[in-house]
């Protein structure tokens, strides 16, 4: 259970960094070779060196971000940690109205040198009921 507890604690720290709009703190959890599929991008973003400036720019353009995981699940398989679930992602841009989108997410972590590092993240917007 210690690995799952450590993984969950790491994920909670990731969520807190996102909600503070703190790209430096968030990127401290990333592996150098992270691959990200943000919910609003059709393309993958590869590597910490590429993703960090994008996160900084995104956070700089927002007054507030609220990433609220809904019943996240954690699983550990060897040195791989998986966190998945749904979230309400609320953003208030500096130049526009607040919006909320509902997203399903998967965070993949690898245990490297005793620490969980985010190696992949995927978020996809849930379809709206029409």
Question: Language-model segments: which ranges?
Answer:
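Hydrophobic alpha-helical segments of small multi-pass membrane proteins
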Residues: 72, 89, 104-108
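Basic/polar N-terminal segments that are highly enriched at the extreme N-terminus
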Residues: 1-5, 129-130
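A solvent-exposed, acidic/Ser-Thr-rich amphipathic alpha-helical stretch
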Residues: 4-10, 16, 23-78, 86, ...
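Short beta-strand edge/turn micro-motifs at domain boundaries
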Residues: 102-129
